[in-house]
Amino acid sequence: MSSTLPALLCVGLCLSQRISAQQQTLPKPFIWAEPHFMVPKEKQVTICCQGNYGAVEYQLHFEGSLFAVDRPKPPERINKVQFYIPDMNSRMAGQYSCIYRVGELWSEPSNLLDLVVTEMYDTPTLSVHPGPEVISGEKVTFYCRLDTATSMFLLLKEGRSSHVQRGYGKVQAEFPLGPVTTAHRGTYRCFGSYNNHAWSFPSEPVKLLVTGDIENTSLAPEDPTFPADTWGTYLLTTETGLQKDHALWDHTAQNLLRMGLAFLVLVALVWFLVEDWLSRKRTRERASRASTWEGRRRLNTQTL
């Protein structure tokens, strides 16, 4: 037992140091664009990065490389910085992330922000077949056409969250939808694009009307459902509440896990220390009894 204890103490110390090092990582900041992540060409956009109070430095990264630095003053009263792009263009479109520093500690990187420049090409036309007014259960198809040759088309439904369906074709793409429900009602637009971050002018809006409620509208999906391989979900970057809640919950869960692991390590160390102390005590007691017995045996021998 005595030889095992130092090894256990070493393992416990290493685990404790690792846990302590993990707890030294600051939670990731929140990043969003104002007024929107889709920015018309030559318009201004502001990228916001929110961390903790006391942060002395914020860094904005573009496509994995350092793009800008901001050092708020006084840091103890500011937990958000803004990075301005006064003239949006295709070179500024792409993926952004940010980090911040408190003292010597750096945070984890934020989620990626996809910044899109629009109005780069001609305006596409959007139509729907069999028409803008359909009955619940029917299937409809949107057609997005752009005479200027492109490689990708995108269909969006206006609303709280912007869902983007991608289609491909030289001058036109088809977007099948359905069977539709009343949840599919709304206003749609489409864009043409040569890549994920440079889009055309938006098409004129097409409003889809779906008549005839399903039996229980409370069970209808809040947003349209499309084939999983064609859909990407873009949450409006001005609505960051859900992202913040998820990030805070993730960080809290990590802290609870680390604290639980540290507690288990501490309990194990205490148990091994108590066991070692009891083992030593039993050894001393056995030695004491053996010594007493040997003394009595010698005394009896001398008496005889």
From Swiss-Prot:
Parts forming coiled coils: none
Modification(s) after translation: N-glycosylated.
The entry's note on the tissues where this protein occurs is: Selectively expressed by both resting and activated NK cells.
Signal peptide positions (record)? 1-21
> What ranges are annotated Cytoplasmic (topological domains)?
280-304
**Record's bilayer topology term:** Single-pass type I membrane protein
GO CC annotations, alphabetized: plasma membrane; SWI/SNF complex
Transmembrane spans = 259-279
Q: Where is the Ig-like domain?
A: 34-118, 129-211
Q: Please give the SUPFAM superfamilies that the UniProt record associates with this protein.
A: Immunoglobulin (SSF48726)
Q: List the disulfide bonds.
A: 49-98, 144-190
Main subcellular location of this protein, as a coarse class: membrane
Q: Specify the domain of life of the species encoding this protein.
A: Eukaryota
Give me the Extracellular side stretches, as residue ranges.
Answer: 22-258
Q: Which InterPro entries match?
A: Ig-like_dom_sf, Ig-like_fold, Ig-like_Receptors_ImmuneReg, Ig_sub
| Glycan attachment sites | 216
Alphabetical UniProt keywords: Cell membrane, Disulfide bond, Glycoprotein, Immunoglobulin domain, Membrane, Receptor, Repeat, Signal, Transmembrane, Transmembrane helix
Location in the cell reads: Cell membrane
Subunit (UniProt): Interacts with CD247 and FCER1G.
Instruction: Tell me, in a sentence or two, what this protein's role is.
Output: Cytotoxicity-activating receptor that may contribute to the increased efficiency of activated natural killer (NK) cells to mediate tumor cell lysis.
What the record says about family reads: Belongs to the natural cytotoxicity receptor (NCR) family.
**What is the protein name for this chain?**
Natural cytotoxicity triggering receptor 1
Q: State the gene name recorded for this protein.
A: NCR1
